[in-house]
Amino acid sequence: MKKTLKKLLGLGLTCLLLASCEKASNDKTEGELTIGVVQVADHPALDAAREGFIEKLDSENINYKLIDQRANGDLSLIPQFASDMKNKKADLIYTIGTPAAQGVANTIKDKPILFAAVTDPEGAGLTGENITGVSDYVEAGKLIDDFLKLYPETKTFGTMYNTNEQNSNVQVEALEKALKERGLKLEKQGVSSINDIPQAITSLKSKIDAMVTVTDNVVVNAMPVISEALAKDKIPSIAYDEGSVRNGALISEGVNYKKLGNQAGAMAVEILKNNKSIKDLPYEKADSLTTLVNTNTARTLGLDLENEIIKNADKID
């Protein structure tokens, strides 16, 4: 009897310990927030927007655990990610890229949603009561004007973009308008995947004097291939993001996506730490734009590094 009682007591203690461990592993620590991140695809600009957001949270000593989800371009996964975050009672969801923001906003109505790397929030329907963020819209005109100081004889620009990506369509329309106002032409080539890039480059190269790369997920991911192909024919390229310059484009005058993430992170701090209502935080544009030149590409193209535009820009080699 004593042995049986001892076994039962031992078993009960074991069960109690196991239950306690399970609770500890499943529960949040006291005061800990749950923050979800949904990123539409992996590429340098979006990765930097994620990094900047987390950096800002950490600098403000926010106590949180992260649910980090990446769709890798498969948009059907985004509603699943949103449902998972809803079930896990995320306190705030940070979305990177328009499809990510739209997919999460369609599912979650009662928690704050922040976006970054969204070009046209209003056109994308991202103006609800529980959503705000930072737009990466870039005015094409100044970038074109600065480029023309390097290549004044340029008449025809080319661009590749995914016609199914809303951000890309908005940017290309604005680019075409800016070029038309300056009496310049734009040759457009649609692509649906990275596999379309080589043929698109071949089709464009004989028609253009320069290439413009908007922040299109397909195109930005293929930038090393694009840069190499353009360099062979001494065709210069302009980019809307710094990551593309790091991957061989000549010049960008656009968004620093890490700083964009910092800016979105500051909005998260206002909501989570300072108890600001998301309704009182209208969406913002990027605080500042940066001119970045790839000097290795500039040398390949035979440009004078003492040119005023290059001299005054931030530079990488």
Region spans (language model):
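C-terminal motif of bacterial Sec signal peptides marking the signal peptidase cleavage site
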Residues: 17-20
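Bacterial signal peptide processing site
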Residues: 22-24
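Extracytoplasmic "Venus flytrap"
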Residues: 32-54, 60, 67-76, 164
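An alpha-beta-alpha
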Residues: 35, 53, 136-182, 282-297
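Beta-alpha junction/loop-to-helix N-cap segments that form part of ligand/metal-binding clefts
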Residues: 68-123, 216-231, 235-238
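Flexible loop/hinge segments that line or gate small-molecule binding clefts
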Residues: 103, 107-141, 239-251
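Hydrophobic alpha-helical segments within soluble ligand-binding/sensing domains
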Residues: 121-126, 132-154, 255-276
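Hinge/cleft segment of the Venus flytrap/periplasmic-binding protein
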Residues: 270-317
